[in-house]
Each structure stands twice: as C-alpha cells, then as structure tokens.
Amino acid sequence: RNQFYLATRSGSEVVDLSRHPEAIHEWGGWSPDGRRVSFSANRQDKSRFDVYIHQVGATEKGDYEGEDRLLCQGPGGYFNAGEFSPDGTKVLVLHYPSNSNQFVHVLDVATGEDRNLTPHEGEVRYLSPKWAPDGKGVYVLTDFHGDFLNLARIDLATGGLTFVERPTWDVEAYEISPGGKWLAASINVDGASKLAAVPLDGGSPIAAEIPTGVVEGMEFSHDGARLVFSFNGPRHNYDVWTWELGRGTKPRQLTHASRAGVPDEAFVEPELVRYDSFDGLKIPAWLYLPPANVRGNRKPPVVVYPHGGPESQSRPTFNSVFAYLLNRGYAIFAPNVRGSSGYGTRFMNKDNVRKRMDRVKDL
C-alpha cells in the first residue's frame, strides 16, 4: 500500500503524511506555493478512490502538523488526483474506468466543484493530463477520433479539443518547459522511441538524433533550455542524457553506468521484421542474432520471447539476459502479437474476449 513521507532538506526528520497504513495512496502533486499536496486514497471505501488536499504545516517549534481535507468523493474505481493549476485554484483528476476508457476532471480546490472536461460515449483513452503554462488549457494524450494516442490541448473555457501533432504512432510521453516555450514528446515508432521538441509558438518540430532504444523520465531544466531524460537501448544500458534545445545540437550522454567489464561488441542491436500470421495479419517482431564471432557459419537455435500483458510490447531495451543468451550462441525472436500496445487501438483489441487464442496462433 503506497504511503507518503515528508523529509526535511537535511534528512534529519521524516514525517508520515499518509497516516492511514491500511489504505492505498496515489500521489497527485504539490501546489505552486508548496503549502498543499493533492492525492487520492481509498480510505473510506476500498473499492473507491477519493481526492484529498493535504495542508502542509509546522509549529513555531518546528514540529510538523498538517491536515487532510476530502475534496471530492470518487465515482468508484480509480479517480487519481493530478497537478495543481498554475494559480493553485484547481486540480486535475483522471477517472480510469478501464484501460481503454478514461475521463479528465477538473476540481475546484476551494469548493470541490467537479467538472468533467472530456464527456464522451463509448471508449476513448485520455492519459497524462497536464496544465498549459497559462492555466487556460489542459494537454492530454488521446485516441479521440483516431487509432493512436496523439497529443491534444483542451481549451478550459470552451471545452474544445485541438491536436498539437498527429503522428501515425503513439505519443508515449511529453513534457512542457517552464514558461511554455517548448513541448518535448517521445513517440513510440514500431517499439523504438523517437524524441522531438515542438515550439509552442507555432514553429516546426525538431527531431533529436538518438540511438535505437527507449526514452523515459523526461524533465526540463528550470530555465527551459535543456531537456534531461533517461535512455536505454540494446547497446546502451540505463543512463541520463541531456538535449539543449534551439541550438542545433544533438542529445548528449551525461552518465556512463558500469557494464562490469563487458565489451561493447557483446551487445547486439536487433532487426525489426514482420511476418504473416494465419489470417494474413502482419506481426512485427524484434530479431536478435548472436554476434558474428559467436555465430560463425551455423544457424543458431532460437529463443522465442512472447511478452506478457497482454496489453504490452516488446521494445528494444537493455536486457542482460538477452545479452547472455546471444553470447552463448542463441538467437532471440521477440514478437508483438495481436493485442500488443503501440500499434493502435484496433490492433490492441484484436485478441479481446473470444479472440484471445488468436494471439497464440500468431506464434
């Protein structure tokens, strides 16, 4: 069960903010003035998450004293608090009825008034809501009127939705720079991340040159001039990279995590392939072949690696087990059978209910 703790800057004191160990707590965010915290918890009903505001405070002696206020009772299921608005008067909430259907709500911090910002019928995904820097809109990832998760902005006054970019792939993550000059987005293209920055003043997107792999954990510097992110790939273990925007420079690797003496040539970059399934559906897969000095002229035995989920995806990430098998002479075949994420909603729904065994036939 998730719990929250507040530590002093020196680390000399740690305070339990949750104070309800029997409940699950989901983090929302800090208010702009640093005096309040938004969060969700199932304290009153284990099947329902409600939204709370925690007032952070301390006595003159430095003793911690804070209190929770129930802001809004959830409708049932996941009702997860998010960011405060730039002026601190509102909080975003994501209502999560299912993996393929979400609603974005805006709560008034003073009154608890609840506004559903994305009313709809049927199943539509709305994910990763974030406030626009001016507080007049909300950015969101959605497959509204489309097959892929694309980045859109919802106008708070009118409720109108405008797409920022509509690539034919999922936008998997994004961040907005302080001041609102840049919007950085990571796009899942056939399983590999493509990183781009969009000037919010209307300029053309800028693509970053990065190796084959996956971008995670993006964050802008305080001045908005640099993007910092975590990156890993088949030939790159997890490291921190930085990208200076607007200067025509390439992303630069900042850290160099240890590989325990394993040489670079031991790590293999896979080939993206496709094959026809029983009904003609094209199935994407990553094919890893042993290094040439290990493989020689013989055909290697193959390890087939179907991912779990089922709504998940095999991606070109750093995998020490794969590296071991490859250097022992095994090839690895990692298919993304129907039902996998990353290839659009229709592809993801192709193994639903009675079609579940079709994904097995893909193998």
Where are these regions (language model features)?
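Short glycine/acidic-enriched loop and turn motifs that connect beta-strands
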Residues: 1, 42-47, 97-100, 144-147, ...
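Hydrophobic or amphipathic alpha-helical targeting/insertion segments
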Residues: 3-9, 13-15, 27-37
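Multi-bladed beta-propeller domains
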Residues: 7-24, 44-46, 52-80, 87, ...
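Blade-terminus and WD-like Trp-Asp/Gly-His loop motifs, strongest in beta-propeller folds
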Residues: 28-36, 82-90, 128-137, 174-182, ...
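Residue-level recognition of strand-loop junctions within catalytic nucleotide-signaling folds
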Residues: 42, 143, 188, 200, ...
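Serine-hydrolase catalytic core recognition
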Residues: 217-363
